[in-house]
Design a protein with these regions (language model features):
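A short glycine-rich, Lys/Arg-flanked "PGG" loop and its adjoining helix->strand segment in the class I
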Residues: 121-133
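A conserved beta-strand element that flanks and buttresses the S-adenosyl-L-methionine
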Residues: 109
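Conserved class I S-adenosyl-L-methionine
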Residues: 1-37, 75, 138-163
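Core SAM-dependent methyltransferase catalytic element
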Residues: 182-200
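Class I SAM-dependent methyltransferase SAM/SAH-binding core
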Residues: 43-97
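Conserved S-adenosyl-L-methionine
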Residues: 171-182
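Short catalytic micro-motifs in class I SAM-dependent methyltransferases
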Residues: 112-113
Length: 200
């Protein structure tokens, strides 16, 4: 994934109070879409240190924490071991480079991940292939924000344009809404976050 080198460097100090707070808001939004997932397998895609997925372990039968950064995965493994978690596993893998042959999931969720992926359509297409029939992809990210100028990330996403792209891939029943607005939460700018729920 783009910016992997940056995440490798900051993995050990990633869990700041601000990130923990945003992760809680994100996981609460995701939880509202997975009420019937107790026996299901989920992937926390681009999991970082697992801040979002750790909040959702009780919502699923099992969770695979997946990231391109070995140091981030190391942080997740340490948390799993320390807390004695039994329904979680980890995988270090880059979806931008290749497609996993045997990976399957009922739910995939990704929070503040898409903005770090330069070319999002191929990755969303590969995630579609990973989903079981009827499975859900849940995306939490920032609404498009013209105040954000960066060479490292997208400046958010237009929900309609993202939904159109996903419809072309094959996703259906696509629903999205803005659910949170915060001060200086996106590259130092005031911003809003949306959640998108799409089904295979």
């Amino acid at each position: 994934m783009a910016n992997t080198d940056k995440f490798e460097m900051i993995a050990g100090m990633y869990d700041t109070p601000e990130r923990i707070y945003i992760a809680k808001i994100s996981s609460d939004a995701i939880r509202k879409h997975v009420a019937d997932a107790k026996g299901k397998h989920a992937i926390d895609f681009g999991c970082g240190t697992g801040l979002v997925g750790m909040n959702l372990l009780d919502a699923f039968g099992s969770v695979l924490f997946l990231d391109t950064s070995p140091n981030m995965i190391h942080q997740v493994r340490a948390k799993i071991a320390e807390l004695g978690i039994r329904n979680a596993d980890t995988l270090c893998f880059d979806f931008e480079q290749e497609s996993p042959a045997d990976l399957r999931a009922d739910h995939i969720f990704m929070a503040q991940v898409l903005l770090h992926i330069p070319d999002v359509e191929p990755v969303l297409s590969r995630l579609y292939d990973v989903l079981n029939e009827g499975g859900h992809l849940l995306i939490v990210d920032f609404d498009k924000n013209e105040q954000v100028v960066s060479d490292l990330v997208h400046n958010g996403f237009d929900q309609g344009e993202l939904a159109d792209m996903m419809g072309r891939i094959g996703y259906r029943d696509i629903r999205s809404k803005t659910f949170y607005k915060g001060s200086k939460i996106f590259m130092g700018q005031d911003a809003s976050m949306f959640i998108l729920d799409a089904r295979k």
